[in-house]
Amino acid sequence: PLDMTNISVNYDDKWLYNADRARLHTFVENCRQAMKTGEPGFSFNFGDKQNETLRNACTEVTSEDDSDVCNLGSINMSNIKDIEEFKHVVELGSKFLVCGTLRADLPYEKVYKVREKNRRLGLGLMGIHEWLLKRKAKYEVTPELHKWLEVYRDESKKAADSHCDRLYLSRPVAYRAIAP
């Protein structure tokens, strides 16, 4: 009955701060099973993010708000030559996704209200492996990639917030989402 079903385990503050040794056993057993079958996926949600159980292992999104939507789009890093161009593309991508929250036709009224409240964006990255290969790097976080990821984090929020302010819109509750 669970064939083709994604199973995800949510690790939250209650699990993190549990002094019981069963906590470690649970994690080890989950890892063992995931390495054997690919399930379960893990979701780590701690601190102020502990209620953001917004994804499973495939990054399929479910929100704690009924009828929520997320406007998604990705940047192909392998097509970008330098960090200045990347910064500009992140800015444009973020603004584009904000505009998409204004124009999309939605199925019913509640979705419009939740969208206005959350204005959830998911600016993603793809082509990271090819980007690394072009720089003769392994598939790992290099110092250069770390700088680019900082630009991605900072500029996506800055651009979306400033564009929302300019248009008198609510600011997004989320800005980025990267699929595996």
Question: What do the PLM-derived regions correspond to, one by one?
Answer:
Residues 1-49:
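Glycine-rich ThDP/TPP pyrophosphate-binding loop and its adjacent helix/strand module
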Residues 34-135:
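Function-dense linear segments that define catalytic or interfacial modules
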Residues 2-21, 96-112, 116, 127, ...:
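Internal maturation/activation junctions in enzymes
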Residues 25, 31-36, 50, 59-67, ...:
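A general structural signal for short secondary-structure junctions and capping/turn motifs
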